[in-house]
């Protein structure tokens, strides 16, 4: 009888369920997965990265050394899904291989610019004074030139080639990251936990890279993802002008340059590389918008 009453009493009590702890990482994924457009863009970017890694295994033909002289400038067919160009090369294979070249140029150039610009921004924002004035005046000079003109000037001095294109695009990415990180540093260094770290004897480098830099990571990640699209366009523009990738390298901008003379009789030769550039840049921009809204929901509201 006593056990029956105890069970009845326990049955009336509310059940306390174990709730999962809400971490910043889980909150980020929860907000990001609600944005279907950004998720689709992220999946497309992952697909592009997979293509870039395994392009040589996905190509039906050699991108540089295969020539089908019987089907010059022929449109899409079962043998050549996106057609062939004026030299008989398979456009689909060249676009797949061009994915590796364009993504590498865009990502590595922004990565170099991010590393240098972030370091300069931390130093300028933390120390201020003469260091801030010198770094920001150099950034102002670089900002005075349009990005594409600055890249053209750098490549004209250093010479053509994709390696020099990466350097040129990285140079005009440096001031953008420096100004972004400097603004964050000016705000973060005034917070209480920075003063606490300084009072406990932490040196400047520890404060910069262990306390201030993590507070700027979200802004850097968002800007990094959105900057890649601009870098891909700039690299393609330089290749289109003959200053970047050189034939027979299947870079998207170089493919557009080669297609200029055949656009009337074979428009597909220019349409598909242009579409590849458009979709790639759009995907990175949409992904950047989604990351921004997920990392800082206050901006969205």
UniProtKB/Swiss-Prot annotation:
Keyword annotations: Cell inner membrane, Cell membrane, Membrane, Transmembrane, Transmembrane helix, Transport
InterPro entries reported in the protein's UniProt record: BP-dependent_transpt_permease, MetI-like, MetI-like_sf, OppC_N
Gene Ontology cellular component terms for the protein in this record: plasma membrane
GO molecular function: dipeptide transmembrane transporter activity
Residue intervals passing through the bilayer: 37-57, 103-123, 141-161, 162-182, 220-240, 264-284
Membrane-protein topology: Multi-pass membrane protein
UniProt keyword Transcription regulation, yes or no: no
Subcellular location as annotated: Cell inner membrane
Record's protein name: Glutathione transport system permease protein GsiD
């Amino acid at each position: 009888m006593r056990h029956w009453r105890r069970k009845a009493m326990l049955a009336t009590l509310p059940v306390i369920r174990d709730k999962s702890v809400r971490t910043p990482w889980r909150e980020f994924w929860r907000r990001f997965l609600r944005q279907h457009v950004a998720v689709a863009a992220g999946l497309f970017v992952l697909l592009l990265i997979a293509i870039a890694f395994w392009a040589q295994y996905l190509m039906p033909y050699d991108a540089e050394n295969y020539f089908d002289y019987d089907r010059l400038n022929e449109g899409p067919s079962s043998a050549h899904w996106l057609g062939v160009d004026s030299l008989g090369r398979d456009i689909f294979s060249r676009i797949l291989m061009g994915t590796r070249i364009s993504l590498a140029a865009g990502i590595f150039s922004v990565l170099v610019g991010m590393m240098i610009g972030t370091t300069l921004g931390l130093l300028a924002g933390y120390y201020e004074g003469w260091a801030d004035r010198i770094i920001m005046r150099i950034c102002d000079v670089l900002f005075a030139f349009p990005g594409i003109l600055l890249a053209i000037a750098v490549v004209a001095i250093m010479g053509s080639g994709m390696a020099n294109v990466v350097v040129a695009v990285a140079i005009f990415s440096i001031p953008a990251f420096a100004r972004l990180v400097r603004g964050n540093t000016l705000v973060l260094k005034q917070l209480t936990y920075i003063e606490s770290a300084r009072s406990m004897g932490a040196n400047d480098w520890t404060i910069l890279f262990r306390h201030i830099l993590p507070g700027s990571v979200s802004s850097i990640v968002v800007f990094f993802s959105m900057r890649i699209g601009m870098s891909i366009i700039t690299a393609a523009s330089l290749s289109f002008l003959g200053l970047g990738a050189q034939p027979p390298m299947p870079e998207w901008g170089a493919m557009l340059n080669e297609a200029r003379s055949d656009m009337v009789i074979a428009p597909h030769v220019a349409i598909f590389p242009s579409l590849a550039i458009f979709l790639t840049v759009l995907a990175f921009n949409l992904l950047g918008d989604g990351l921004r809204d997920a990392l800082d929901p206050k901006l969205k509201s």
